[in-house]
């Protein structure tokens, strides 16, 4: 009887190891599917974009069976915490605030932000540097923010909700602007084109992609933004306790960087090399 019981326990242990290994080789990745060209859907509803293709290559490098699932942006981090998926690849910038809740892999791409207006706007021709990094500070940054504060006074600026762009506008760095939030970037773009907002703030490539596909006269104005509230590049979001998965993603990202895959995909989807 004891031998039978030992055999039973051994079988249970073997099954536990088997299922643990199977789960370790299976990864579910959450993305929004509504932030082109980072992630989007084609006419058939298939997920496409820079991060969708990159995720597939990272999974090959990790020898993992991956599934990419959709999640609304404002529920992205809660969904990860609730274990609806194991990782986030959704144009999510690495910020100190987010790292209080989740971990991030090393960055795989830069995401510079920009203000956008419709052609003919009074905001065209803002006299600012081409780019500012809020982490470095200095007179150029201070002067640029001062110029923006004066120019944006009384203006309504559209942003996607729960983003670094909303956080920046509400930080007071550019005065007390009127911020209008939207569930998706597509809604921001549509209201900008319709003249229901004066300007919008998002990743520069989100506007250039929209302009190219819609034919609308969207114009980028002012400086591009990085650092500070805008974070330190885009990375894979992972739960705090998934330390091995974090190591696996970092190793795969290193491989993709060294063999040029990130650069290749960035040029394909963004039109320039945004790899980090």
Positions of PLM-derived features:
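A conserved helix-loop-strand patch within extracytoplasmic ligand-binding domains
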Residues: 64, 93, 104-157, 162
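Bacterial N-terminal signal peptides
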Residues: 9-18
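Periplasmic-binding protein-like
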Residues: 33, 110-114, 208, 212-251, 253-269, ...
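Short helix-initiation/N-cap motifs at beta->coil->alpha
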Residues: 52, 67-78, 141-145, 179-194, ...
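Extracytoplasmic small-molecule ligand-binding "clamshell" domains
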Residues: 24-94, 100, 259
């Amino acid at each position: 009887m004891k031998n039978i019981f030992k055999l039973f326990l051994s079988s249970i242990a073997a099954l536990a190891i088997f299922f643990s290994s199977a789960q370790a080789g299976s990864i579910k990745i959450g993305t929004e599917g509504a932030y082109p060209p980072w992630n989007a859907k084609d006419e058939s509803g298939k997920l496409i974009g820079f991060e969708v293709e990159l995720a597939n290559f990272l999974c090959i490098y990790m020898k993992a069976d991956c599934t990419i699932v959709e999640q609304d942006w404002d529920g992205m981090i809660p969904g990860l915490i609730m274990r609806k998926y194991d990782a986030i690849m959704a144009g999510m910038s690495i910020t100190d605030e987010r790292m209080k809740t989740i971990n991030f892999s090393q960055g795989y791409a830069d995401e510079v932000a920009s203000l956008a207006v419709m052609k003919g706007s009074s905001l065209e021709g803002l006299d600012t540097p081409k780019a500012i990094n809020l982490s470095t500070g200095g007179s150029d940054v201070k002067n640029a923010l001062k110029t923006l504060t004066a120019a944006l006074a009384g203006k309504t600026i559209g942003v996607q909700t729960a983003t670094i762009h909303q956080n920046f506008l509400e930080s007071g760095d550019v005065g007390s602007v009127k911020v209008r939030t939207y569930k998706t970037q597509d809604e921001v773009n549509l209201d900008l084109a319709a003249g229901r907002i004066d300007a919008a703030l998002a990743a520069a490539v989100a506007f250039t992609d929209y302009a190219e596909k819609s034919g609308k006269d969207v114009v980028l104005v002012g400086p591009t933004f990085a650092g500070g509230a805008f974070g330190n590049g885009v990375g894979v979001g992972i739960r705090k306790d998934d330390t091995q998965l974090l190591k696996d993603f970092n190793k795969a990202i290193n491989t993709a960087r060294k063999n040029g895959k990130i650069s290749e995909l960035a040029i394909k989807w963004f039109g320039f090399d945004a790899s980090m």
